[in-house]
Each structure stands twice: as C-alpha cells, then as structure tokens.
UniProtKB/Swiss-Prot annotation:
Protein name according to UniProt: Olfactory receptor 4C46
This protein's encoding gene: OR4C46
Keyword Disulfide bond among UniProt keywords: yes
Keywords assigned: Cell membrane, Disulfide bond, G-protein coupled receptor, Glycoprotein, Membrane, Olfaction, Receptor, Sensory transduction, Transducer, Transmembrane, Transmembrane helix
A single cellular component GO annotation: plasma membrane
Extracellular side: 1-23, 68-103, 163-202, 258-266
Gene3D superfamilies in the cross-refs: Rhodopsin 7-helix transmembrane proteins (1.20.1070.10)
Described purpose of this protein according to its UniProt entry: Odorant receptor.
Length: 309
C-alpha cells in the first residue's frame, strides 16, 4: 500500500499557542493520563487477585480498562509532549498510526460495551444459566469479536485515508490526527469518501447503540418480576454501564455522523471521548459497584497486613 503524495509531515496546532496555557494543559492532561493508567492497574490487579470477581462480567471490565488505557495512550502522550516542548510536527506515518490506533481501540470499546450489555442481560434475566451461557468458549469468542471488529473498522478507515493525495497546506487545526481534519487537507474531491467513512463509523456507532438500547429495554422489562433488593443491585450495575455508554457514544456520533467540516467544538468533544471518558470509566464502575469496592478494600487491607509483618 503506497500513498500518492509527497507530504512527509503534518503540523498539529494543538489546543492553544499561548505558552502559559500550554503549561497548564501539560499539567492537567498529565494528571488525567496518570489517573487513567492508575485506574486501569487498580481494576486489573483487584480482579486478578480477587476470586469473588472471577465471573465474565468482571473479565469484561478488566478488558474495558485495558482498552481505555490504550485508547488514551494513542493521543494523550503526544498532547503532553507537544504542550511541554512546543513540538507540533508529526510524521505522515505517525499521523496514520494515530488514526489507526484511535479507530482500533475506539471500535473495540464500542463493541465491548455491547458485549457487556449482553452479559448484564444474561446475568439479570437468566441468572441460573449464567455460567452455562457465558462459558469460557463463549467469552473467548466474544473477546475475539471485540478485537477483530476494532481491527476491521480501523483497517477500513486507514485504507480510505492513506490513499488520499496531500499536496497543499499541512497544518491541522487539532491536537491529534483524525479523519475530518485530514479530509479537509486532501487535494481532491472527498465527498464520496466522507459518505463511506461516515457510513463505516456510523454503522459501528448506531448498530452498537441500537443493540445496547434493546438489551436494556429487555432488562428493565424483566426487572418487574424481581425482588426490590435484586432490582436495586441490577439497576446499580446497569446505571454504571449506561453512563459509560452515553459518555462514549454520544460524542462519537456527533463527530462521525456529520459532514467532514471542522467545527470549533470538535477539539473539546475529542478530548472528552478520547481522554476524559477513559479516565472516568474506572471511577464510575468502581464507585457504583459494591463488590469492586469491597474487593479493593480487602486488597488494601491485605497489603497493610503484609506491610506490618
């Protein structure tokens, strides 16, 4: 695969060109990135070290934390580096790698959220058959679908964008390489390509969102026959998941289900779904899940006891 242009690098304008603001941006996003990574490590260590969290539901949560950490790592380190050193140039291949990473991990996360909704449906509506339905083979198959779906989605996007001729300005008014800013720099008519890309991203977003809505409608209908305590526990789990779904899908639909014109609000929206949401996900699932909180307390108590010895 070979691109048809002589463009070797792009210039990312970032969030601001004000030196004082760049220092503030460096501190803020460095803290956000540290919280994201620490949240991922905390969740994975807690689930791995706690036998009570060995169900597929918590395995999916560990995968979600891993994907969030990777998703945030695609753009956040670059933004931090650019804010600290003022380096704005990014090589063409580096830009394409960013685009691929964004859509690989973003696509995988969208599919995983749908898988988690199915898992919640089975746990709430068919509790006696949960471990039979969500056996190791099914879990492995679903995780395979998550990764292959993300890879296929990202590959389609990168094949479209890599072949575009770039022969004019190379300045991107964004803090990351993304489809819409790149389409605006192409030296050709990109109208049909915009439709293909919107269809690809839109299909992923809308299909997963529709499946999620159906899952939760069925879950809510089935809760009418459950006890009050069971309803409260199920709703607590579902509210956490629905919150994460809204935080992830609404910004993505806003960005990718419209023409490629770049809007001033795009940077803020991109920050939200590529950095803020991955940071919030571990907090949302931990604070809303009694089993996770108890497991973290036990893990901390165990470390305190071993430290005293």
């Amino acid at each position: 695969m070979e691109n048809r242009n002589n463009m070797t690098e792009f210039v990312l304008l970032g969030l601001t060109e004000n030196p004082k603001m760049q220092k503030i941006i460096f501190v803020v996003f460095f803290v956000i990135y540290i919280i994201t990574v620490v949240g991922y490590v905390l969740i994975v260590v807690t689930i791995t070290a706690s036998p009570s969290l060995g169900s597929p539901m918590y395995l999916s949560l560990a995968y979600l934390s891993f994907i969030d950490a990777c998703y945030s790592s695609v753009n956040t380190p670059n933004l931090i580096t650019h804010s600290l050193y003022g380096k704005k140039a990014i090589l063409f291949n580096g830009c394409m790698t960013q685009v691929f990473g964004e859509h690989f991990f973003g696509g995988a996360e969208g599919i995983l959220l749908t898988v988690m909704a199915y898992d919640h449906y089975v746990a709430i509506c068919k509790p006696l058959h949960y471990m039979t339905i969500m056996n190791q083979c099914v879990c492995a198959l679903l995780m395979g679908v998550v990764w292959m779906g993300g890879f296929l989605h990202a590959t389609i996007q990168i094949l479209f964008i890599f072949q575009l001729p770039f022969c004019g300005p190379n300045v991107i008014d964004h803090f990351m390489c993304d489809l819409n800013p790149l389409l605006n720099l192409a030296c050709t008519d990109t109208h049909m390509l915009e439709l293909f890309i919107a269809a690809n991203s839109g299909f992923i977003c809308l299909l997963n969102f529709a499946l999620l809505l159906v899952s939760y409608v069925v879950i809510l209908c089935s809760l009418r026959t459950h006890s009050l305590e069971a309803r409260h526990k199920a709703l607590s789990t579902c509210v956490s998941h629905i919150t994460v779904v809204i935080l992830f899908f609404v910004p993505c639909i806003f960005v990718y289900m419209r023409p490629a014109a770049t809007l001033p609000i795009d940077k803020a929206v991109a920050i939200f779904y590529t950095m803020i949401t991955p940071m919030l996900n571990p907090l949302i699932y931990t604070l809303k899940n009694a089993q996770m909180k108890n497991a973290i307390r036990k893990l901390c108590s165990r470390k305190d006891i071993s430290g005293d010895k």
